[in-house]
């Protein structure tokens, strides 16, 4: 028996040696970018465990292996970009080659298979839906049309804060504010399911955030069932879908009635989508699921990024009292004597704009942006990038790169004074909203929902930390999800400086 087992064990040993030699030869001949050591099955995942947040861990790995780094995250061949030079190569020089998005397990279920603007594959449909977003949904004119919505919702918040006699949960209040602004912009003033919808959006964001084990091994369908994630995602999706079906139906009925009665009304975002859907000249007809996907994109991207940016801006100003004092002095000088603050004057707040630029540099809402996907095999900087490789651009690391930023980890708004660096995608050392064809189309809408609330909160209130916490003691810990938020909610004590004029409140 032992004799018979010898040839078998020898054969197995030979096969194993052959596979190892073959693997070694493949690795030797491979022109993949450098990266850390990979293990069977899990690939490079062990390098991301126990090293803090993903964007931090990836920056640390890039310091060892370079700004163009290859990882194997489970089944996903992954390219990590950590310098402005490599970001330019991916999002400008070879932008078309990397114009696809990676649709993950969770977003595939929640967002109708990636039919929205954020995840749709590059092609005729994506070009059409982006054009609709840029020219119709999120144009400067459309953003301006929601000025009254912003004014009323911010006034409601200011009134609520003024009524508080002690500390407030600033984080929760800002999240509620941005949700309410976007809900009114999307659905109009009356939406019976608004609170249920917003609660489901929050649950969906929590489920989709961060690294997901089932998403790292997409071929192992059993994992999706074992973890229970698929069932949870499908439940949230189905409940959101039910609400969106009713909203779209109501808007279509309103549109038909207005045509019959020749009534005119101010369009909300769903109205715009319904009107565009009726256009028979569209190159790619829009089904209701396309409309739903775009609506969800606006909520998931718009609310999270705006509230996160306000929260970090306030945190940084509290930690840097000189910045807070200077920003408040500017706001109160510009708005001095005004009975009603209007958005035109926001453009005069040059220092506040520097504060927000610096906030976005240090706290890009999505630090790894939305992953791209290589459409065809190509060569970058002498390395071969296989087709279907997922690309993560570490905007957080690039925004702190000492090659581009002196004292990169410090909050210094003045660094932007007198320079033309902006977040519109042409300065690759500063890409909080991405760049190239897939740059965020909602920047105008998002920044309007940041600048106006922050300016008014600085105008109406003085802010201090509770419980005798000193500025230098304020924790700035992060938590990683769809966006990177504060790990702990920001609690503050407001003191009314300028009372709210009755004309700006909405009863």
Curated annotation (Swiss-Prot):
One of its GO terms (molecular function) is oxidoreductase activity, acting on paired donors, with incorporation or reduction of molecular oxygen. It is found in: Membrane. GO terms for cellular component: membrane. Combinatorially expression of Sinopodophyllum hexandrum (mayapple) genes of the podophyllotoxin pathway (e.g. DIR, PLR, SDH, CYP719A23, OMT3, CYP71CU1, OMT1, 2-ODD, CYP71BE54 and CYP82D61) in Nicotiana benthamiana (tobacco) results in the production of the chemotherapeutic compound etoposide. It comes from the Eukaryota. GO terms for biological process: phenylpropanoid biosynthetic process. The chain crosses the membrane at residues 1-21. It catalyses: (-)-deoxypodophyllotoxin + reduced [NADPH--hemoprotein reductase] + O2 = (-)-4'-desmethyl-deoxypodophyllotoxin + formaldehyde + oxidized [NADPH--hemoprotein reductase] + H2O + H(+). The keyword Metal-binding applies. InterPro entries: CYP450_71D, Cyt_P450, Cyt_P450_CS, Cyt_P450_E_grp-I, Cyt_P450_sf. It is an enzyme of class 1 (oxidoreductase). Rhizome-specific expression. Its main location: membrane. The keyword Lyase does not apply. Its cofactor is heme. PANTHER family: OS06G0641600 PROTEIN (PTHR47953:SF19), OS08G0105600 PROTEIN (PTHR47953). This is Desmethyl-deoxy-podophyllotoxin synthase. The lineage of its organism: Eukaryota, Viridiplantae, Streptophyta, Embryophyta, Tracheophyta.
């Amino acid at each position: 028996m032992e004799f018979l087992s010898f040839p078998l064990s020898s054969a197995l040993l030979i096969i194993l040696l052959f596979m190892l030699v073959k693997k070694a030869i493949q690795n030797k001949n491979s022109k993949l970018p450098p990266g850390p050591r990979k293990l069977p099955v899990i690939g490079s995942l062990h390098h991301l465990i126990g090293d803090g947040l993903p964007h931090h861990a990836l920056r640390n790995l890039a310091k060892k292996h370079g700004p163009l780094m290859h990882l194997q995250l489970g089944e996903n061949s992954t390219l990590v970009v950590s310098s402005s030079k490599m970001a330019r190569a991916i999002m400008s020089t070879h932008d078309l080659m990397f114009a696809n998005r990676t649709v993950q397990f969770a977003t595939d279920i929640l967002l109708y298979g990636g039919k929205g603007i954020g995840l749709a594959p590059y092609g005729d449909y994506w070009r059409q839906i982006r054009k609709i977003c840029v020219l119709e949904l999120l144009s400067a004119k459309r953003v301006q049309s929601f000025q009254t919505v912003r004014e009323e919702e911010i006034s409601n918040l200011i009134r609520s804060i003024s009524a508080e006699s002690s500390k407030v949960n600033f984080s929760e209040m800002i999240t509620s504010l941005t949700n309410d602004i976007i809900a009114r912009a999307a659905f109009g003033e009356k939406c019976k399911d608004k609170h249920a919808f917003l609660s489901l959006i929050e649950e969906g964001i929590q489920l989709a955030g961060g690294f997901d084990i089932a998403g790292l091994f997409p071929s192992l369908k059993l994992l999706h069932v074992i973890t229970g994630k698929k069932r949870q995602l499908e439940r949230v999706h189905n409940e959101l879908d039910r609400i969106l079906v009713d909203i779209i139906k109501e808007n279509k009925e309103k549109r038909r009635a207005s045509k019959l009665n020749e009534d005119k009304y101010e369009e909300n975002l769903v109205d715009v989508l319904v009107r565009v859907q009726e256009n028979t000249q569209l190159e790619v007809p829009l089904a209701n699921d396309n409309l739903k996907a775009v609506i969800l994109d606006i909520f998931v991207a718009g609310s999270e990024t705006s509230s996160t940016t306000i929260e970090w801006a306030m945190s940084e100003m509290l930690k840097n009292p000189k910045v807070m004092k200077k920003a408040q002095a500017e706001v109160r000088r510009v708005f001095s004597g005004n009975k009603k603050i209007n958005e035109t004057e926001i453009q005069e707040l040059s220092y506040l704009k520097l504060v927000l630029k610096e906030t976005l540099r240090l706290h890009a809402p999505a630090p790894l942006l939305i992953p791209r996907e290589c459409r065809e095999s190509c060569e970058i900087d002498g390395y071969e990038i296989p087709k279907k490789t997922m690309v993560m651009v570490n905007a957080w690391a690039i925004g702190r790169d000492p090659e581009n930023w002196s004292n990169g980890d410090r909050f210094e708004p003045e660094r932007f004074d007198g320079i033309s660096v902006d977040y519109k995608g042409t300065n690759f050392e500063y890409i909080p909203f991405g760049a190239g064809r897939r740059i965020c189309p909602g920047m105008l809408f998002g920044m309007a929902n940041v600048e106006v609330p922050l300016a008014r909160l600085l105008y109406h209130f003085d802010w201090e930390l509770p419980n005798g916490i000193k500025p230098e003691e304020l924790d700035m810990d992060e938590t990683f999800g769809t966006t990177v938020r504060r790990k702990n909610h920001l609690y503050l004590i407001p003191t009314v400086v300028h009372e709210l004029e009755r004309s700006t409140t909405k009863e």
